[in-house]
């Protein structure tokens, strides 16, 4: 760790080599985290920003690249956290568990006035990802942005004409009150931002600018849809256009035609849009499941504009979805079978995670996750090898190496109350993708070709979503609800995978070892 060490000299080189000219950065870059006032929906508030913008700048690279992202913490605002971490959502971090970014699982936070270099490779991954703070609810205050790893040999390349920085679409919930100053569980966002712009339906809002996405009639576009949400899921659609899904969270899938996509916090999809309609303006809609749930006056909206169309707001009308995305229709393009034997419990280790809530905290198997003062990775490197020795007590599960694992998430109702209110809860597993052998809304198991992803909705009452993965990546990996307010209330566990080989598989840099002493020395006002 260093004081504001800079990589700007190599940033210019990497940008010139990548040829991407729409403001993207990476794979070698500085990423400065600072406070600034922003007005994305007509209301001004102080925020935590990456690169001085919301959402944070698009970070790009190619399959096989080494990413070297130097995070510089310039945070000073007393109403929000001054320390930070960055998680690279969906990146496996094989051999670099220390760079996964989950505070108190994989690292101590970066102290204000300091920097830390995240250095990792993506040898076997390509697709649509994102990055965000993984310290308490900090990303709800603005520290979130898209990450794309391009594949020069993309199997789907023949299906589209355009795939660049202009075809990334982020969906965000936005709050006018800093996360630590507001309620523990907000009733809903104040607005929804599409690529950083939206409208607030309350006092002081009005007809603010909306994001305009421009297409040329006759071309086919690969849009990369990224939910950088803290809480709500969105129903996404584009008036007058169908979408063909080809990628789910960094995994290529068979082409699937839909006219709406329900997308949960942390999820990503690539879809092909054929710009085959008349030259005009069309509403893009992203309706959240909480807060304002319509599009009156252009809230929850952006604009799809064909080249040469008049620069006015659309007059198109929403229609009832007739081919909405159904998760069980998604089929991986390569190696589609789930790990293990094709039967219930046909794995090396199966477990059920039972949820509960006491009014202020969430529990998994009767334990609420309380961040330890010593990161789980550091505990393992210091000699702790079994669950009984690892903190937080009851929230760390050791997993054997090279084994098939099955996890079930039963959602039940007792005396009229859900075991975990605020459903549906999207659960994200770090360090892996998994096969969803039973999806929300389904009572059947699919072992032959289930969707493969890293973030899944666990559904509603009566659901028992079940996932499978293989333990081929030593280290501690977070499994948690991606509704960030729920995570902050303890809705998480850690899988300590192959603890015996964690140290040899994940050599840590000196700068990582310096993080905890620096953070632990901070005054409470600088945390």
Curated annotation (Swiss-Prot):
What residues does the Plastocyanin-like domain cover?
Answer: 25-150, 162-306, 373-498
Which Gene Ontology CC terms are recorded? extracellular region
Which sites bind Cu cation 3? 134, 430, 480
Where is Cu cation 4 bound in this sequence?
A: 425, 481, 486
User: InterPro entries given for it?
Assistant: Cu-oxidase-like_N, Cu-oxidase_2nd, Cu-oxidase_C, Cu-oxidase_fam, Cu_oxidase_CS, Cupredoxin
Name any cofactors this protein relies on. Cu cation
- One of the record's GO molecular function terms: copper ion binding
Q: What subcellular compartments does it reside in?
A: Secreted
Disulfide bridges in this chain: 108-516, 140-230
Positions contributing to Cu cation 2 binding: 89, 132, 482
- Please state the protein's primary subcellular location: secreted
Q: Which Pfam families match?
A: Cu-oxidase (PF00394), Cu-oxidase_2 (PF07731), Cu-oxidase_3 (PF07732)
Cell membrane keyword on record: no
Q: Could you say which residues bind Cu cation 1 here?
A: 87, 428
Q: Which residues are glycosylated?
A: 74, 77, 156, 209, 233, 242, 276, 317, 358, 366, 393, 402
Catalytic activity reads:
4 hydroquinone + O2 = 4 benzosemiquinone + 2 H2O
Q: Which UniProt keywords apply?
A: Copper, Disulfide bond, Glycoprotein, Lignin degradation, Metal-binding, Oxidoreductase, Repeat, Secreted, Signal
Task: Tell me its EC number(s), please.
Answer: 1.10.3.2
* Signal peptide, first to last residue: 1-23
Has the keyword Signal been applied to this entry?
A: yes
Role played = Lignin degradation and detoxification of lignin-derived products.
**Member of which family?**
Belongs to the multicopper oxidase family.
PANTHER family attached to this UniProt entry = LACCASE, MULTI-COPPER OXIDASE
This chain belongs to which protein, by name?
Laccase-5
Q: What is the lineage of its organism?
A: Eukaryota, Fungi, Dikarya, Basidiomycota, Agaricomycotina
């Amino acid at each position: 760790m260093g004081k504001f060490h800079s990589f700007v000299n190599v940033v210019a080189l990497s940008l010139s080599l990548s040829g991407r000219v729409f403001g993207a950065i990476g794979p070698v870059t500085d990423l400065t985290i600072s406070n600034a006032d922003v007005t994305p929906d007509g209301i001004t508030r102080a925020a935590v920003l990456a690169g001085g913008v919301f959402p944070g700048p698009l970070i790009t690279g190619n399959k096989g690249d080494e990413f070297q992202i130097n995070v510089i913490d310039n945070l000073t605002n007393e109403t929000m956290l001054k320390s930070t971490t960055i998680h690279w959502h969906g990146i496996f971090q094989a051999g670099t568990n220390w760079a996964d970014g989950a505070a108190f699982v994989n690292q101590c936070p970066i102290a204000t006035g300091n920097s830390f270099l995240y250095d990792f490779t993506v040898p076997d991954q390509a697709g649509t990802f994102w990055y965000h703070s993984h310290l308490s609810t900090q990303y709800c205050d603005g520290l979130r942005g898209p990450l794309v790893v391009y594949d020069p040999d993309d199997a789907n390349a023949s299906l589209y004409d355009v795939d660049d920085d202009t075809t990334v679409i982020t969906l965000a919930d936005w709050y006018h009150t800093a996360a630590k100053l507001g309620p523990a569980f907000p009733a809903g966002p104040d607005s929804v931002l599409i690529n950083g712009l939206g409208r607030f339906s309350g006092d002081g809002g009005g007809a603010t600018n909306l994001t305009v996405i421009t297409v040329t009639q006759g071309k086919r576009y690969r849009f990369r849809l990224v939910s950088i949400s803290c809480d709500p899921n969105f129903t996404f659609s584009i008036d007058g256009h169908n979408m063909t899904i080809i990628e789910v969270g960094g995994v290529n899938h068979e082409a699937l035609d839909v006219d709406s996509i329900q997308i949960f916090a942390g999820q990503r999809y690539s879809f092909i849009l054929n710009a085959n309609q008349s030259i005009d303006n069309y509403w893009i809609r992203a309706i959240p499941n909480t807060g304002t749930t319509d599009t009156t006056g252009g809230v929850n909206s952006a604009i799809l504009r064909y080249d040469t169309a008049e620069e006015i707001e659309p007059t198109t009308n929403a229609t009832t979805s007739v081919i909405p995305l159904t998760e069980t229709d998604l089929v991986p393009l390569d190696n589609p079978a789930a790990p293990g034997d094709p039967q219930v419990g046909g794995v090396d280790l199966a477990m059920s995670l039972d949820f509960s809530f006491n009014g202020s905290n969430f529990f998994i198997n009767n334990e609420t996750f309380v961040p330890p003062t010593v990161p789980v990775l550091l505990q393992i490197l210091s000699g702790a090898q079994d669950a009984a020795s690892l903190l937080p007590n009851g929230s760390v599960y050791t997993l054997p190496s090279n084994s098939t694992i099955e996890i079930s998430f039963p959602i039940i109702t007792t005396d009229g109350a859900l075991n975990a209110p605020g459903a549906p809860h999207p659960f994200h597993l770090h360090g892996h993708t998994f096969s969803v052998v039973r999806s929300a809304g389904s009572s059947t198991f699919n072992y032959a070709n289930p969707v493969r992803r890293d973030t899944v909705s666990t559904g509603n009452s009566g659901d028992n979503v079940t996932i499978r993965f293989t333990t081929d990546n030593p280290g501690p990996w977070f499994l948690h609800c991606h509704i960030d307010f729920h995570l902050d209330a303890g809705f998480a566990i850690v899988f300590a995978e192959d603890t015996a080989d964690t140290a040899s598989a994940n050599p840590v840099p000196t700068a990582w070892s310096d993080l905890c002493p620096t953070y632990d020395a901070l005054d409470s006002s600088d945390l």
